């Protein structure tokens, strides 16, 4: 008989979905930007100069105010 496999590495902690929404009175608003390709249920990661979707890889660059003022 085959030996039983041991336990693999620990799982990464899951994200708290409640951090992505803000409740004010009776209204709920999203705090992060949604991916335009994947839809409203997929949030984009906010980096220094861009937004990135972890599901489809869509990138959207932020507009840099410093470069626009210089031109």
From Swiss-Prot:
InterPro entries: Ribosomal_eS31 (IPR002906), Ribosomal_eS31_arc (IPR022845), Ribosomal_zn-bd (IPR011332). Binds 1 zinc ion per subunit. Pfam families: Ribosomal_S27 (PF01599). It comes from the Archaea. Keywords: Metal-binding, Ribonucleoprotein, Ribosomal protein, Zinc, Zinc-finger. A zinc finger (C4-type) spans 35-56. Zn(2+) binds at residues 35, 38, 53, 56. GO terms for biological process: translation. Gene3D superfamilies: 6.20.50.180. Part of the 30S ribosomal subunit. Belongs to the eukaryotic ribosomal protein eS31 family. This is Small ribosomal subunit protein eS31. It comes from Methanococcus vannielii (strain ATCC 35089 / DSM 1224 / JCM 13029 / OCM 148 / SB).
């Amino acid at each position: 008989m085959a030996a039983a496999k041991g336990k693999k590495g620990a799982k990464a902690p899951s994200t708290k979905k409640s951090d992505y929404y803000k409740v004010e009175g009776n209204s709920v608003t999203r705090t992060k930007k949604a991916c335009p390709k994947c839809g409203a249920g997929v949030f984009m990661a906010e980096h220094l100069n861009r937004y990135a979707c972890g599901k489809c890889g869509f990138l959207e660059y932020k507009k840099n105010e410093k470069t626009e003022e210089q031109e």
